[in-house]
Swiss-Prot record:
The organism of origin for this protein: Coffea canephora (Robusta coffee)
Cofactor field: Mg(2+)
List of residues binding Mg(2+): N179, D261, F263, N264
Job of this protein: May be involved in the biosynthesis of caffeine.
Official protein name in the record: Probable caffeine synthase MTL1
Length: 385
């Protein structure tokens, strides 16, 4: 089975769907919104071609469920707020939004939400239906998605860690797995495996930057948010917990060791310095600002986390309930690729053990994601300077 067929979130609206388990991302979007407004402010001041008539934006790796339209809402609100601050008396521009993700993404679940979204946008923002046009653009952001110099603003949230393929070189010339008992480039992985993952990320991220520079107008903006490498004190990350859960099943005899050794997740968490250096080396973009922030990986569990998300009764608000919440989120993201390799029957057992391990981390007050926000501007051509 092709990687792109299984590298997607759980669709639909069931209990294991991404739509029902993406409150962490909702909280993260709230943290990013001030940076989004600043990025839009700089974009409108740059006075790009046609920007007062139609602003073309895209969400790269939009996934599915209500969070997809939260990103659109925040972008539209930021555009209208900044134009008001600038006392722009011209008629509001049309906003054309492209939602992009791999072909297997559940775009239909997003389309079902559009009628109510448009009505709410008209009621709360005064935007008449037709002044914000939303369409899907299926495809991989590791290749071209839009015509040359056609876009004003590009946004991506928690997608860049996914690689275009599992790195090559993870099996030796003798057919021996180089990344034994690991499922990604972890601290325990041997140096050749870590290098293979870094090389693949470097290739993919450099290609991503080059493709986006071709699609953006000169001085167009891009805002990226992603997980980045954290500190030792953050505790094991969720990929470590997933790896531990699968290893537990191997020890119990529920899974064969060879099944684990042949499984490698196409994901790489870069360091801040790695991302910064790659942007500078590719050369198409200027870094306007770069900032990190931490979130617990059980963030979004309750409304006490500064976000309007589903709440839980106090008697269940302990580390076990929080761990189950984290397990549901990770399952909604990785179940398709796990099921394609290990089979669907073992999935509940994997995430039961995941939750058990996560509870131990949460009890110790650990378990953090380090998040990176980076705002980029496409460098002007010499003829534009």
């Amino acid at each position: 089975m092709e990687l792109q067929e299984v590298l997607h979130m759980n669709g639909g609206e069931g209990e294991a769907s991404y739509a029902k388990n993406s409150s962490f991302n909702q909280l993260a979007l709230a943290k990013v919104k001030p940076f989004l407004e600043q990025c839009i402010r700089e974009l409108l001041r740059a006075n790009l071609p046609n920007i007062n008539k139609c602003i073309k934006v895209a969400d790269l790796g939009c996934a599915s469920g209500p969070n997809t339209l939260l990103t659109v809402r925040d972008t539209v609100q930021s555009i209208d707020k900044v134009r008001q601050e600038m006392k722009n008396e011209l008629e509001r521009p049309t906003i054309q939004v492209f939602l992009t993700d791999l072909f297997q993404n559940d775009f239909n679940s997003v389309f079902m939400l559009l009628p109510s979204f448009y009505r709410k946008l008209e009621k709360e923002n005064g935007r008449k239906i037709g002044s914000c046009l939303i369409a899907a653009m299926p495809g991989s952001f590791h290749g071209r998605l839009f015509p040359e110099e056609s876009m004003h603003f590009l946004h991506s949230s928690y997608s860049l860690q996914f690689l275009s393929q599992v790195p090559s070189g993870l099996v030796t010339e003798l057919g021996i797995t180089a990344n034994k008992r690991s499922i990604y480039s972890s601290k325990a992985s041997p140096p050749p495996v870590q290098k293979a993952y870094l090389d693949q990320f470097t290739k993919d991220f450099t290609t991503f930057l080059r493709m986006r520079s071709e699609e953006l107008l000169s001085r167009g903006r891009m805002l990226l948010t992603c997980i980045c490498k954290g500190d030792e004190c953050d505790g094991p990350n969720t990929m470590d917990l997933l790896e531990m859960a699968i290893n537990d099943l191997v020890v119990e005899g529920r899974l064969g060791e060879e099944k684990l050794d042949s499984f490698n997740v196409p994901i790489y968490t870069a360091s801040v310095e790695e991302v910064k250096c790659m942007v500078e080396e590719e050369g198409s973009f200027e870094i306007l600002y770069l900032q990190t922030f931490k979130l617990r990986y059980d963030a979004g569990f309750s409304i006490d986390d500064d976000c309007q998300v589903r709440s839980h009764s106090p008697e269940y608000s302990d580390e076990h309930a929080r761990a189950a919440h984290v397990a549901s989120l990770i399952r909604s993201v990785y179940e398709p690729i796990l099921a394609s390799h290990f089979g669907e029957a073992i999935i509940p057992d994997i995430f039961h053990r995941f939750a058990t391990n996560a509870a131990k981390v949460i009890r110790l007050g650990k378990g953090f994601y380090n998040n990176l926000i980076i705002s980029l501007a496409k460098k002007p051509e010499k003829s534009d300077v």
